[in-house]
Amino acid sequence: MAQLCDTIIHAHCIVTQNKERVILYNGSLAITSGNIVALGPKEEICSFWDAKETLDLCNMLVMPGLINAHTHVAMTFFRGLADDLPLMEWLKSYIFPIERHLTPETVRWSSLLGYAEMLRTGTTACLDMYFFEDVVFEAAIKAGIRCTGGESIFVFPSVSCDTAKTALEHTKKMAELYSDNTRINVVVNPHSVYTTTPQVLSQCIEVAEECSLPLHIHLSETTTETQICLQKYGLRPVSYCRDLGILTPRTTLAHVVDVNLEELTCLAEHGCVISHNPSSNMKLASGVSPIPEMIKRNLSVGLGTDGAASNNCLNMFMEMGRCALLHKVYWNNPTALFAQTVLDMATLGGAAAIHQPKLGVLAPGHPADLIALDMSMPNLQPMFNPISHLIYATTGMEVFLTMVEGEILYYNGTFTRFDYDSLSNEMKKVSHWVKEKLQLL
């Protein structure tokens, strides 16, 4: 007698991302209570399982949802505002001044827009750092996406918290509030070494240990950051963070561009996770993170878009393609990063970055966080190698379905939890608000 499950999905091709990197053709998977309970040939699944709902995606490729390993999702309101500038000028002349005027409502609508873009292009989880992070979480709950995040922590007052202590207390309250929410996870988010002090970073470590929370920080993003750290503390950023105790297996480091081989070995020895943000680093001319050297040292590396202000999109398919091509040309080696390696970064590496190892793979016992792509699109035919197409040919617009914990959040042009037209109208108001604030600079 067949067992009953909630949903069965049939697909032309299933990219599992399991340990063997199995690609299953004419396969199916069964889902119950948000988790995958079976995966295999269509005939086998149909003979053992009956479903309340069946999705026949016969022309489609099903794969794990992508994981954005570093972003500032609410910064969609900055998209296209300040381009073609170096990082420090970009931050000090545009980003920080306008952020002083932020309101929770601006963050709410801008976050929801960011999540809409993510879901539309196949992202099911992200690692976020911003202000009014409780509102960022509320928008994530509205959209249904997974969000790991926390309040940005600075030594100086921010628009949402007057002190680092206040930001840390807020972080602790959010951790308690969302402790039972499977899609919301809290991290301790010190912004960087140049916007904090040793005392602030030590306080961040204490809270992370006290509450058993991961820690997420921008590190070694530019040579300017390195110079600032050397001038202030007589150490390069990696050594500075090592001596403070920042570097642990529960720490995710965003960017990690201006590093030497000795520092990479140090990061590997401490088990840190890296978030690579190639588009942002290219746009701001921050440099190129030595990803091949990291992989040689068995460092876990995720892939992130950074914020829409410095990318200018939150599309992980575009990020994968840029990542692969950047390293080929930078290292003058077409094998510097293989397509499979880049896909691993956007799935399994992302799961490591948000410290949720069950994500990034389609297998029994794992959450049903998945996406389906229409492989009949002109740019995806013919298909000899699915992994090649995912990295070098897919744009993200082929995404037909996005699912988190077995729940469909995007399906064939429609978001299931919110009205996109209403969101678009709200963003027009946000755009006017930004223009008003620009006049104050």
Swiss-Prot record:
Its EC number is 3.5.4.28, 3.5.4.31. It is an enzyme of class 3 (hydrolase). Keywords: Hydrolase, Metal-binding, Zinc. PANTHER family: AMIDOHYDROLASE-RELATED DOMAIN-CONTAINING PROTEIN, AMINOHYDROLASE SSNA-RELATED. CDD domains: ATZ_TRZ_like. Zn(2+) binds at residues 70, 72, 218, 306. HAMAP family: MTA_SAH_deamin (MF_01281). This is 5-methylthioadenosine/S-adenosylhomocysteine deaminase. Substrate binds at residues 99, 191, 221, 306.
